[in-house]
Curated annotation (Swiss-Prot):
Residues 306-384, 488-511, 559-590, 603-612, 621-639 have a biased composition (Low complexity). Residues 337-489 form the VPS9 domain. GO terms for cellular component: early endosome; late endosome; plasma membrane; transport vesicle; tubular endosome. GO terms for biological process: early endosome to late endosome transport. InterPro entries: UPF0507/Ank_repeat_27, VPS9, VPS9_dom_sf. PROSITE patterns: VPS9. The keyword Cell inner membrane does not apply. Keywords: GTPase activation. It comes from the Eukaryota. GO terms for molecular function: GTPase activator activity; guanyl-nucleotide exchange factor activity; SNARE binding. This is Putative uncharacterized protein DDB_G0284213. Pfam families: VPS9. Residues 306-385, 488-513, 551-645 are annotated as: Disordered.
Amino acid sequence: MDEDLNHNLFFKTIKFKFPKIFNTIESKCYTLCIPQSPSLYRMNITQKIVESHVFIESKYYQSEYETLNKESNYIIDNGYIMEKENNNKKVKIMFDELCYNKDYKSYRLICIEEPLTGGASGLNSSISRSESDLGDLLITQGIVKPQRPTFDQATQFFLLDSISTNINTIVFRKANQQLEEFERLHSINSKTDVDFFRKDLLLIHNRLMDDLVCANADFKQLHSNEKQMNSLSLILESYILGKIQNKLYGDLKRLYEKENQHLYEKMIYLSKLSFEDIGVKSDFEPHLTKAKEVIESFNTGINYINNNNNNNNNNNNNNNNNYNNNNNNNNNNNNNNNINNNINNNINNINSNNNNNNNNINNNNNNNNNNNNNNNNNNNNNNNEIIITPMDKLLSIVQGSREIEESIKARAILELADEDDILTITGDDALPLTAYLLIHARPKYLATDLAYCSKFILTDIFNSSYGYHLVNLIAAIDYIKSLDILSPTKTTTSSNNSRNTSPTSSTTNITYGGNSESLFAQSSVNNSTISSPKQPEDEAALFNNLKKSLSTMNLNPPQQSQQQQQQQQQQQQQQQESNFYSNNNNNNNNKTFNNSIPPHFISNQNSNNNNQFTSTPNLFNNNNNNTNSNNSNNNNNNNQHNSRYSTMSFSTNISNNTNISNKYVKAPAVISLDDDSDNLGDFIGKLRDMRDDEVIVSTHFK
């Protein structure tokens, strides 16, 4: 199906940006060559390029044309356009259309496969791109949008590649003065200052945006298109934030210093968890290799700043070394001269020449070494990608997600998988995937990066895919905060080491949720001198410190195994049977209860054993004088069991003289005694037979 030329970027640019050229084509019935839309990728449409695509037919030769700028001659033959001087260069004609002007005279539009001049080098024009993808790469009317809005690309766009460079230079000279004054007067000392800092910075951005649109006629034509204005705003934002990056990011690092340390320590623990523990499906594991490499660039901007500082230090050290070497050489020369004062002048001259030669050789070697060091440092800087703007950090997350999608597509094509069997990234998968990539990247200033991206992306991006990835980044960091710190294997190992006789801990993770921050706060208070761990021993020390802080918390008791529950039930049954037959001999003893013990401190297995004939629950098992040794052991076991899960210390020991009996051997017999005297004999007989049992006598008088 042929392309609709009314939506072609090249054709629209000629009509709106170069109307004089288009009127000339219509009025004089020239031929216009229009490259197809996929071939316009990264093409800067200038007036010279437009004139090279306007053909004027020769008066003397058929099918021979001259361009409007008089620079080239072309021949149209057998569906191709060829240069007259070079027949090897051919451009295929896709289709042509015949149009009419207001005087009903015809002129010709030819759609060609690729531009005759000015196209992107090395671009395969056969690669088709949808119109939406093209809109993300280009701003209409000939203004190219940088693929990655870094500070360098924004500077090149406004001050180097733009047609109206002189006008933009005047605007940005004024903007640089405003930014220097802003950087001198503003600082971030508290979290409330962040909003004021952003508000004032947004005013500068909007004012500079208005100045550019008013001063530049090319930008003024974009004012009616919101999407194009957002793209221009994004480039301008990269320039502004690149200018004040050192000031802004440095203040945010100091403000979120504790949060950065807490998140960094937590990510070290979480990096040892499996995919399932973090919530990532194991199917995504083979598709995360390139994504991890992309997310590693999340800290590159910080490394770049550090490298610059290191280079300055290296240069200073090299200069100092040269100065010291020269001083040493001069001292050696003076010493040699003093020693050789008694020797003739010829020998002195020879020695001085040798010393000078040696000094020159040493100095040359030092200079060569310094040059090599500087070259190595420069090479290292060139290899590091500079990440400065918040938008550039966000694009690292976007690129990581795209790498996963591309890996899934490539594997599906390789395995010839059906569409229903292809792995897809849903909204539920994107959150843990982003969290997993951040955990393994271990950014040292993650809390700062969160504030940097969420607060200082000045352009409205929430109606685009960038907005989705920003929300996903914020949610992923919150997800990291809510994840369990301890892996299942560590939880079981630590519990077994601390209590050899304790029941086996459940291997399910305990999610602390909102208490995760307080956990790290306790750890940082107890270990204020702790540093960022870099070795396995440091990580183990951090883990032990964290385990100590967990011991002060009241956690729910882990579930016991079935074998241990059965053993406890058998012990309870044996103890109850021994108490059933010993209570009758001790009915007259004093009975005291320790009512101060709350029932919820007793184990769950014992708290539900209520007597079926009384309303008082059995808080703990009875002690009998005949079974003191057995019962004391059981009580000690119960005390140990209770102390595992209780943060309060209390005593459940009962003296030997105290016997607790609140159980009947069997249900008491009830004898009804009425006012009828005939039943008195029966009552006495029954009472004589049941003298050893508990008896309740009820009376009812008519």
